[in-house]
């Protein structure tokens, strides 16, 4: 189980048109992965860095 409920949310790029590099926790693979966020919308499973994603969602 991930550390927080936000980590089980599916990747959601949002509904705008920017291309912003971001990271999310992939529940199936149990790891953080990169994706492109649109700049608005989406959900809480979105992080600026892979380190922030790992700190939030992966148990040590």
Swiss-Prot record:
Keyword Glycoprotein: no
Domain BPTI/Kunitz inhibitor intervals: 7-57
Annotated site location: Not important for inhibition of potassium channels: 19
Cellular localisation: Secreted
Tissue-specific expression: Expressed by the venom gland.
Site (described: Important for binding to potassium channels): 9
UniProt cross-references to CDD domains, sorted A to Z: Kunitz_dendrotoxin (cd22595)
Paired cysteines (S-S): 7-57, 16-40, 32-53
Described function: Serine protease inhibitor homolog that blocks voltage-gated potassium channels (Kv1.1/KCNA1, Kv1.2/KCNA2, and Kv1.6/KCNA6) (IC(50)=0.13-50 nM).
Other comments on record: Negative results: does not inhibit serine proteases.
Listed name of the protein: Kunitz-type serine protease inhibitor homolog dendrotoxin I
Organism: Dendroaspis polylepis polylepis (Black mamba)
Lineage of source species: Eukaryota, Metazoa, Chordata, Craniata, Vertebrata
